[in-house]
From Swiss-Prot:
Family: Belongs to the GroES chaperonin family.
Keyword Lipid biosynthesis in record: no
GO terms for biological process, alphabetical: chaperone cofactor-dependent protein refolding
Classification lineage: Bacteria, Bacillati, Bacillota, Bacilli, Bacillales
GO cellular component, one term: cytoplasm
PANTHER family tied to this protein: 10 KDA HEAT SHOCK PROTEIN (PTHR10772), CO-CHAPERONIN GROES (PTHR10772:SF58)
Protein name: Co-chaperonin GroES
SMART domains for this protein: Cpn10
Length: 94
């Protein structure tokens, strides 16, 4: 499994909607870039100026909403992930 460093997290991105609410099937070119996913791994935290480590507010298993064009897309063992900083996460979905 991937282990992110510092204040980074690894997210398994949730798939974009295939249909609109009215049932119209969307072609790939019309789909919005997904902005939510499930956290599968978290880093050890951000190092502050005084040298102490601040733990992350998110945890493995959290479903989050993140900025649209943030992070780096990677494929690991056939699965697509997104690695991004905690500051790119906008909200936790409960």
């Amino acid at each position: 499994m991937l282990k992110p460093l510092g204040d980074r997290v690894v997210i398994e991105v949730l798939e974009a909607e295939e249909k609109t609410a009215s049932g119209i099937v969307l072609p790939d070119s019309a789909k919005e870039k997904p902005q939510s996913g499930k956290i599968v791994a978290v880093g050890s935290g951000r190092v502050l100026d005084n040298g102490t480590k601040e733990p992350l507010e998110v945890a493995e298993g959290d479903t989050v909403i993140f900025a649209k064009y943030s992070g780096t897309e990677v494929t690991y063992e056939g699965t697509d992930y997104l690695i991004l900083r905690e500051s790119d996460i906008l909200a936790i979905s409960k």
